[in-house]
Amino acid sequence: MVHPVQVGKRTRMSFSRLKEVGQMPNLIEVQLDSYDWFLKEGLQEVFDDINPIQDYTGNLNLEFVGYKLDLDSIKYSVEECKERDSTYAAPLKVKVRLLNKETGEIKEQEVFMGDFPLMTEQGTFIINGAERVIVSQLVRSPGVYYDMTVDKTGSKLFSATVIPNRGAWLEYETDSNNIIYVRIDKTRKLPITILARALGYGTDAEIIEFFGEDERLKATIEKDNTKTREEALLEIYKRLRPGEPPTVDSAESLIESLFFDAKRYDLSRVGRYKFNKKLAIHLRITNQIADQDIVNPQTGEILVQKGEKIDKDKAIEIQNCGINEVYIKIDDKSFKVIGNHFVDIHSLVPFDISDLNIKEYVFYPVLKEILDNYADEESIKEEIRKNIYRLIPKHIIREDIYATINYELALSYDIGYKDDIDHLGNRRLRSVGELLQNQFRIGLSRMERVVKERMTIQDQEVITPQALINIRPVAASIKEFFGSSQLSQFMDQTNPLSELTHKRRLSALGPGGLSRERAGFEVRDVHHSHYGRMCPIETPEGPNIGLINSLATFAKVNEYGFIETPYRRIDPKNKRATNDIVYMTADEEDLYVIARSDEPIDENGYFIDDKVTVRAKEEVLVVPVSEVEYMDISPRQLVSVATAMIPFLENDDASRALMGSNMQRQAVPLLKPQAPIVGTGIEYKAATDSGVLPKAKNAGTVVYVSADEIRVRRDSDGGIDKYKLLKFKRSNQGTCINQRPIVSKGEVVAKETLLADGPSTDLGEIALGKNILMGFITWEGYNYEDAMLISEQLVKEDVFTSIHIEEYEAEARDTKLGPEEITRDIPNVGEEALKDIDERGIIRIGAEVRSGDILVGKVTPKGETELTAEERLLRAIFGEKAREVRDTSLRVPHGEAGIIVDVKIFTRENGDELPPGVNKLVRCYIAQKRKISVGDKMAGRHGNKGVISRVLPEEDMPFLPDGRPLQICLNPLGVPSRMNIGQVLEVHLGLAASKLGWHIATPVFDGAIESDIVDCLRKAGYSEDGKTVLYDGRTGEPFDNRVTVGYMYILKLAHLVDDKIHARSTGPYSLVTQQPLGGKAQFGGQRFGEMEVWALEAYGAAHTLQEILTVKSDDVVGRVKTYEAIVKGENIPEPGVPESFKVLIKELQALCLDVKVLNDDNQEIKLKESVDEDADELEVNIEGTENQPEEKEEKEKEDSDEYDDLREEDVEPDLEELSLDDLDLDDFGDEH
């Protein structure tokens, strides 16, 4: 039944029936933990990989001994970095040791290796003043993958791919003649026996003896024309290095370096783990019949007798006592199974070695050697430490290759299984730490080359580590990664939810990943292994669908980069659900039978029903209780945070839920946030983890509260913690960040208590929109096709008003002709335009500005021309001051307006770091209050989006029997075909809850059901169907039928009409075609395309058509004359020839076709090449292109991955659209 739940400072009435076991992890731990790992272990690994650097003679040795990030000498705090456009970073200092082997001299130095960007507490980076997020990348895990295809004759053909982290690939394939081929590093294919010979089994007899009798092997040997190891080596060398003279030695060293050199071939920890998992012998012999006695080589005891079935425990025992070859019986044939000889070290070493921290399997021959040669505990441990890279090799070894070949042979006997590459057990996550590590490795290897060169060039006696090391390549690769990698994205800061989701995003794109064009349908599809790991709902619509995903609420990432999800253990003895929680990867989960979290259990954890619905791999089955092994821990574990915020998600169609999840991220923070009446209970957790809210670092008592600062006296030592609040700051997306205190003086706070609300939060809960009284009713066609009719009350009472802040900057640079100057003294500008400009030439704070107003007065020196006598005279009289300058002031762009809220000035004198050539930088911040208006886009949480079509006076809106007018009318036809019934349930429950004064939590898949809603309506005194009589506000008459009315949570989205509306009379033109540019950012025109031309042709509107195709577009002469005629009030002249026609003729002439234009009398018409000289007297530039207003926003769009809804023509102001001002056309008319 409904029960109260305390969420922060608010009580919600919850409808959940399940007691949740286990806590949701910190929602941004993916970012924090990964970066933490990088600083503690990742960096060290890279240095270990590269140590030591030797010169070509082997005399000098350079080693990186240790490193530290100098956190005490961070230049600026996070806030200062944002203000000063600098990077939040700490210097990385590395201890370097140089050993000269000849003289035995050792030199040690601490070397500065560049500033290393630090992660903020919120999981972001500040790079050049912009807050950025590194998105985690989903890639194929290194490992061995087998696949099967069926050919025309119906026979099964098996293939395999051996994928390292970096290094040469091996690919096996079988053709229809049963011959097995191998491709080494994507070259032409060779019979696989050539590879086997080259690795050591030279003759046919050796191969057959080692791999066992097999039809396909024999067919391959027949095809193979090499017969010895030497021949095989030469054959491989010819394939890999065509054109070089083959010798056996060079072939041997090629194979060695290709596969068995740790610097060239790296499996990585995860690759070794996947190899050992796939190639372990125990998996393939479990449940098979032994064809020979299997004897323990240490003790001589018979483990399995011939003809006996091998069970799972026996199979593991066989593997761990070092047996690597087992004969099994299949269809009366004997088949030899070969493993890769790795064993569990803990079962073989007789004492406890947990302090060595070895989690992986180890290579048995090396371990046996150690155990045979040493007896006492200490020396064995010491030897294991010394030989760790032989025990757990980082590269592939011969045994691995033999095992992969054997697996390929075994598949045709139905031993082993093929892999599904879209399974999350075979895809792993590269998070910040690993991406950074790879980048750092690239930088270090570039540096290694430089060091080696310097070692040979410089004098070995006086050389120092500092002189050898050049940190440029390292610093450059890190900078390149943060600045321009596809995975380093400009943070989506529209609201706290969009921040949080951006940090939890998983992308399959990026370097080393997929590309949009190549990604097929399978990769994008929902897979059964996504359950509890990746959200099946939240993904963008458009070309990236399914390639960009979101982490599920309870998911964690393990040390290998695989995503894990938690399950409750079911006690195997008495089959009761325990509170033990186990995190499992996707391939572990496939081994178990897992019950739903809402399966009925009693208070002791026993199942109530005899039969239970379960998941086993991709099947959903009903099984007896005795077979259940685990149980989900929460119904919301399969969805992401944004999706878990949709109430009644279970009643919505999936595609609408997808839109609902995505649109919540676009909700603009409103002036007065309001938490939803009908929530899901996850709002508090999402807001607290998103990083926008200040929390108490220590327990204590609040001693001071003001709008911009909170002070807390610590309980521990009586000291004071100060918390500065952000006031009206601009976010990355231009929305407003403002924090408001929610504690009062004297309040006692515990550690981690929220002290203030941020943008879009209300008492610590995410509050993206408003609770609005609405009804499903049509009104005079104004809500046709998803349009919305709203009441003027929403405008008057600032219900949907938001604040937007834009930043504009002007810089004074040094030019060839002298420095630019920021000044109030601007040529040809009247006093009226300068009324709000102070004596420095900068606008005052608080001034109201409109488009075209000056923000920063700036003049640039003009080029010197030959002076006339009069000018020389003036120069002589007035001195230098009459020198020509032109006005290049920063003005408010077209269509913008607002109030100046802040001005920042950076100069060299004040010690600010400015880019080279810049003397002074001024930033102005303009704030606008945007009320809701016609054309704004609004949406509910169920994918029900619409555009406002009309703002109706309150008195005309339909009203309830108690006289309250509705605030919004939605079209009832928007519900049935879209199947998002959740919105109707939300409206009913909202109606009852607002009357009862409740806030409600109805968690996804575990929320209120129909009977609960009916009970609430009854309790609130409404009719049970949730409908009521509505009266027409204009006539006072009741409408014919009763109408569903209630409270719905509605968001105002970032697609605001003010940003989209755009008009142009004249403006920039494309250079080649002379047609107007397109798009608001380029101040372009409206495209009149092919189909629009057909429409005019169809109605015979010849003059309109001619005008549009010529003087309004690319008839250069005509448009100047036309403008002149309009200004002077004369008739519009005849149009001339469009520029694109001239371009067409030039194209044809470029193809060597002699094209001429003839008139009726077959006389050639000369096409004028340029504008009439006299047409340029007007003070308007029509033939050239204006400087295009470049909006910062556009650059940011490019940075982020969100340009799903941009069309190509919106983005590409191509090379040909350079502005004419960039060209040096001094004689091209007046300067304007």
UniProtKB/Swiss-Prot annotation:
User: What is the official name of this protein in its record?
Assistant: DNA-directed RNA polymerase subunit beta
EC category:
transferase
Query: Entry's Gene3D superfamilies?
Result: 2.40.50.100, 2.40.50.150, 3.90.1100.10, DNA-directed RNA polymerase, beta subunit, external 1 domain, DNA-directed RNA polymerase, subunit 2, domain 6, RNA polymerase alpha subunit dimerisation domain, RNA polymerase Rpb2, domain 2
Per the record, the similarity remark reads: Belongs to the RNA polymerase beta chain family.
Positions of the region Disordered? 1170-1232
List the source organism: Clostridium botulinum (strain Hall / ATCC 3502 / NCTC 13319 / Type A)
Q: Which HAMAP family match?
A: RNApol_bact_RpoB (MF_01321)
The Gene Ontology biological process terms listed for this entry are: DNA-templated transcription
Q: Where is the composition biased (Basic and acidic residues)?
A: 1189-1198
Describe its function.
DNA-dependent RNA polymerase catalyzes the transcription of DNA into RNA using the four ribonucleoside triphosphates as substrates.
Upper lineage is: Bacteria, Bacillati, Bacillota, Clostridia, Eubacteriales
- One GO molecular function term? DNA binding
> In which residue ranges is the amino acid composition biased (Acidic residues)?
1171-1180, 1199-1232
Q: What CDD domains does the record point to?
A: RNA_pol_B_RPB2
How is this protein organized at the quaternary level?
Answer: The RNAP catalytic core consists of 2 alpha, 1 beta, 1 beta' and 1 omega subunit. When a sigma factor is associated with the core the holoenzyme is formed, which can initiate transcription.
EC number assigned by the record: 2.7.7.6
Which catalytic reaction applies to this protein?
Answer: RNA(n) + a ribonucleoside 5'-triphosphate = RNA(n+1) + diphosphate
Its cellular-component GO annotations read: DNA-directed RNA polymerase complex
Q: State the UniProt keywords alphabetically.
A: DNA-directed RNA polymerase, Nucleotidyltransferase, Transcription, Transferase
Q: Which InterPro entries match?
A: DNA-dir_RNA_pol_bsu_ext_1_sf, DNA-dir_RNA_pol_bsu_external_1, DNA-dir_RNA_pol_su2, DNA-dir_RNAP_su2_dom, DNA-dir_RNAP_su2_hyb_sf, RNA_pol_bsu_bac, RNA_pol_bsu_CS, RNA_pol_bsu_protrusion
Tell me yes or no: is Transferase among this UniProt entry's keywords.
yes
Annotated PANTHER family: DNA-DIRECTED RNA POLYMERASE I SUBUNIT 2 (PTHR20856)
